[in-house]
């Protein structure tokens, strides 16, 4: 669960290393964000020649949380740290980003087309289980 003042790691190559949540989007009374939710963040730490600078305010999609994620089959997914991917105001990335992450929720609509669990015709693809330590570098655009 991500709330205001939560520090998150950045899981892309935008140049930001650490961000802080300043608002959870989705209603005036909404307190917590989970995997797949959009939040407003402030960049707290960035590399010197990155695309973003310290103090920039951007939107981000939460991709990993330390809170348990329960799946319908009864399995539980948990990460060591909270992480997010920076996006622009139109819910798409403003540049090509390489993201190293394990996809925690495939049904949120924020996964790359080659990693989604549904084909164009609507038939479901049987997802192959991957070990929890497996990480993939994915070139994506986060559009619904």
From Swiss-Prot:
Which keywords annotate this record? Ribonucleoprotein, Ribosomal protein, RNA-binding, rRNA-binding
What's an example GO cellular component term for this entry? cytosolic large ribosomal subunit
A GO molecular function annotation here is:
structural constituent of ribosome
One biological process term in Gene Ontology: translation
Region Disordered, as annotated, extends over 107-144
Q: Which is an annotated Pfam family here? A: Ribosomal_L14
Q: Member of which family?
A: Belongs to the universal ribosomal protein uL14 family.
> Which HAMAP family does the record associate with it?
Ribosomal_uL14
Q: What does this protein do?
A: Binds to 23S rRNA. Forms part of two intersubunit bridges in the 70S ribosome.
Give the matching PANTHER family. Answer: 50S/60S RIBOSOMAL PROTEIN L14/L23, LARGE RIBOSOMAL SUBUNIT PROTEIN UL14M
Summarize the subunit comment.
Answer: Part of the 50S ribosomal subunit. Forms a cluster with proteins L3 and L19. In the 70S ribosome, L14 and L19 interact and together make contacts with the 16S rRNA in bridges B5 and B8.
Please give the name of this protein: Large ribosomal subunit protein uL14
Q: What is the lineage of its organism?
A: Bacteria, Pseudomonadati, Pseudomonadota, Alphaproteobacteria, Hyphomicrobiales
Q: Which gene encodes it?
A: rplN
């Amino acid at each position: 669960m991500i709330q205001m003042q939560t520090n998150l790691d950045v899981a892309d190559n935008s140049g930001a290393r650490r961000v802080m949540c300043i608002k959870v989007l989705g209603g005036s009374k909404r307190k917590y964000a989970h995997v797949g939710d959009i939040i407003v963040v402030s960049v707290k730490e960035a590399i010197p020649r990155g695309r973003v600078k310290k103090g920039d305010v951007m939107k981000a999609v939460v991709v990993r949380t330390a809170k348990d994620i329960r799946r319908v089959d009864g399995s539980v997914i948990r990460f060591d740290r909270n992480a997010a991917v920076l996006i622009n105001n139109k819910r798409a990335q403003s540049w090509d980003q390489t993201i190293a992450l394990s996809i925690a929720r495939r049904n949120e609509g924020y996964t790359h087309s080659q990693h989604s669990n549904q084909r164009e015709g609507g038939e479901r693809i049987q997802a192959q289980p991957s070990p929890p330590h497996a990480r993939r570098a994915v070139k994506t655009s986060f559009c619904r």
